[in-house]
Amino acid sequence: MKFIVKLYPEIMMKSKPVRMRFTKMLETNIRNVLKKVDEDAKVQRQWDRIWVKVPNDKPELAQAFGERLACIPGIAHVVQVDEYSFTSVDDIYQQVLPVYRDQIAGKTFCVRVKRTGSHDFNSIEVERYVGGGLNQFTDAVGVRLKNPEVTVNLEIEGDKLYMVTKRIEGLGGFPMATQEDVLSLISGGFDSGVSSYQFIKKGARTHYCFFNLGGAQHEIGVKQVAYHLWKTYGESHKVKFVSVPFEPVVAEILEKIDNGQMGVVLKRMMMRTAARIAERMGIQAIVTGESLGQVSSQTLTNLNVIDRCTDMLILRPLIAMDKQDIINECRRIGTEDFAKSMPEYCGVISQKPTVKAVLAKVEAEETKFSEDLIDRIVEQAVAIDIREIAEQMNTRITETETVVAIDTNEVVIDIRAPEEEENKPLEIEGVEIKRIPFFKLATQFADLDKQKTYLLYCERGVMSKLQALYLIEQGYHNVKVYRP
């Protein structure tokens, strides 16, 4: 069994050297991701496609491979195929017939062929021959070229016939690391998760910068969002998560800054700090989730004033998106439930925010800050490899337990993503198992029976520890981590 990875059309339009570089990078990215699923994964690059081979003795890996490929930037779509050899057009038909006889019975169908290589026939001739044979010697209703109930997809390359058994849509975009790195300001809300995802999809290695205004609980929640985005869409490359203790800045704003200017001043201080951190990391651009007119600090006038605080390029991929469109995208990429349970701190510090800030007035207000404030904040920022989040949780999860045995009043919650759970169901005889994906746990845990203890389970124990620590921070103490 194999997968044929089709490149995103924008890659195909590049010049030959750029196309080769992008294709080679995509091959490396696919290999990096799939090797974490199975060490025997085989990945081979061609000019206009990439082949992925599922080990013959491990057909169960096909679903896992397909799910991972669907989340790798730079892929238009993936087709899962079974491989056959052939000697003639009739030989092709004879091999297609037993595979599709039952599938097209009582239905309309058509045959579609893609062919590469030198043959004494063309694609249309194969379509007519195979289609005619299937129409004559099966119980199909007939051929319908437009909107058939079943499409028989075949690909021919040299003397090989590939029958397409499944088509998986890809992310599109460019392969990871074909663009320069960016530093994304992430709060854990709807907007910043989507803006981060869009730059991952565009091929930029996306690092995360979090301005902590709400203590440990807020940081844990944001780390879950960042880890989910990286693990799902950017796992092929290492990135950093930077946590900035921003409470001192907020304290000085509340104490010294005019009420109407607070929102704009806060954003300018964030941009200054992020720019300093980005420079240290060799990054040339900051990404934010700002959208025009969404809040008072995001008017054109205010955004212009905010941008004047630094020479660093500030990118706003959501600038013209409606809020509902952002939420819909948030739901699609799996960060909606995180965002719903995330506290919002930035909007409460100004009662009468200005929508037309004057640069001179804002700069005058900023002279009231302590001279070394940003220097101190930057020095206190903590940057970690995002892969270390699991290890960090191990050192902080002292308030909960990791168990291997299950007691009478304990319930196991399988928090894996639905596709993971379906691929490898958790079954424990005599034990109640609830299936709540990790991205829904924060919103659904409050509805569970408080008299019972819940054991969180995931494949590697990373997300279960994150979720346990987050729930403990919220005041729940009937939660443990289950590691059989």
UniProtKB/Swiss-Prot annotation:
A Pfam family this protein belongs to?
A: THUMP
- Paired cysteines (S-S): 346-458
> Which GO biological process entries does UniProt record here?
thiamine biosynthetic process; thiamine diphosphate biosynthetic process; thiazole biosynthetic process; tRNA 4-thiouridine biosynthesis
Tell me which residues this entry annotates as catalytic: 458
Cellular component GO terms, alphabetical: cytosol
Q: Which UniProt keywords apply?
A: ATP-binding, Cytoplasm, Disulfide bond, Nucleotide-binding, Redox-active center, RNA-binding, Thiamine biosynthesis, Transferase, tRNA-binding
Q: What general EC class does the enzyme of this chain belong to?
A: transferase
Domain THUMP stretches: 63-167
GO MF terms here are: ATP binding; CCA tRNA nucleotidyltransferase activity; tRNA binding; tRNA-uracil-4 sulfurtransferase activity
Places the protein is found: Cytoplasm
Q: Which reactions are catalysed by this chain?
A: [ThiI sulfur-carrier protein]-S-sulfanyl-L-cysteine + a uridine in tRNA + 2 reduced [2Fe-2S]-[ferredoxin] + ATP + H(+) = [ThiI sulfur-carrier protein]-L-cysteine + a 4-thiouridine in tRNA + 2 oxidized [2Fe-2S]-[ferredoxin] + AMP + diphosphate; [ThiS sulfur-carrier protein]-C-terminal Gly-Gly-AMP + S-sulfanyl-L-cysteinyl-[cysteine desulfurase] + AH2 = [ThiS sulfur-carrier protein]-C-terminal-Gly-aminoethanethioate + L-cysteinyl-[cysteine desulfurase] + A + AMP + 2 H(+)
Q: What are the residue boundaries of the Rhodanese domain, all occurrences included? A: 406-484
Principal subcellular localization: cytoplasm
Which pathway does UniProt place it in?
A: Cofactor biosynthesis; thiamine diphosphate biosynthesis
Q: Does the keyword Transmembrane apply?
A: no
EC code(s) of this entry: 2.8.1.4
Where does this protein hold ATP?
A: 185-186, 267, 289, 298
Q: Which domain of life is it from?
A: Bacteria
NCBIfam families registered for this protein in UniProt = ThiI_C_thiazole (TIGR04271), tRNA uracil 4-sulfurtransferase ThiI (TIGR00342)
Role, per record: Catalyzes the ATP-dependent transfer of a sulfur to tRNA to produce 4-thiouridine in position 8 of tRNAs, which functions as a near-UV photosensor. Also catalyzes the transfer of sulfur to the sulfur carrier protein ThiS, forming ThiS-thiocarboxylate. This is a step in the synthesis of thiazole, in the thiamine biosynthesis pathway. The sulfur is donated as persulfide by IscS.
Which family does the UniProt entry place this protein in?
Answer: Belongs to the ThiI family.
Write down what this protein is called: tRNA sulfurtransferase
Species assigned in the record: Shewanella sp. (strain MR-7)
